[in-house]
Amino acid sequence: MTKSPEPGALPTLGAFADEDAGSPPSLFPDYRSTTFRSPLQAPLPMAQTLTEVSGPAGCWERLMGAAVADLTRQRAGTPLGQRIVVQGHVLDEHRRPVPHTIIEIWQANAAGRYIHALDDWDAPIDPNFTGAGRVVTDEEGRYRYVTVRPGAYPWGNHRNAWRPAHIHLSLLGPAFATRLVTQMYFPDDPLIEIDPIANAVPMPYRQRMVGRFDIGLCEPNWALGYRFDVVLKGTQATPFQGE
């Protein structure tokens, strides 16, 4: 006989695997580079040690420096492009807030160009935009940052291949091994449907990687607003890149 849950207890979710949340496979032939970097053997489970379960909990800011929540005010001038506000929550499988989560942000500029030396596309570099930021979730699991909408860029996977506009997010938890990486796309971008990286995540899970336009987050006469919640695990989890 199954024991009834205590009043107010959270529901039991049962067995869960990465594929339940649409996590992309390590091998996806349309994404060409996965054909030569995907493991040839099944992954081996490893027991966690002190290295994996410990880390600078509550001390990330002391190690990494102060948060950089406004990417439009890092240099003396103003970056080119459409200013946007991105806000959301980091949640667990029961949609409870996860405070003190570090979120690293990196992206291309409005022309689709990254600032790093290995980006050799001839789109212009914006001297007033680094494309990198970092925020920390508050006690309600909420985060917010200001940036410019990134541009699309070619990436050489196949003829006329273009990556849709996206923002990379890396989430760091209480331990060194608790790093999850995902991307946020934009709801009006036609390139999502033909992008192999995005399409490695099947529908309907792919939709969890698309930010929602939110007029309530828009700053009048200044910036558009998008909402993007991140669920860390469970059947409603945001798809993350493979570990």
PLM regions and their residue ranges:
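Beta-strand-dominated extracellular/periplasmic modules and repeats
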Residues: 2-243
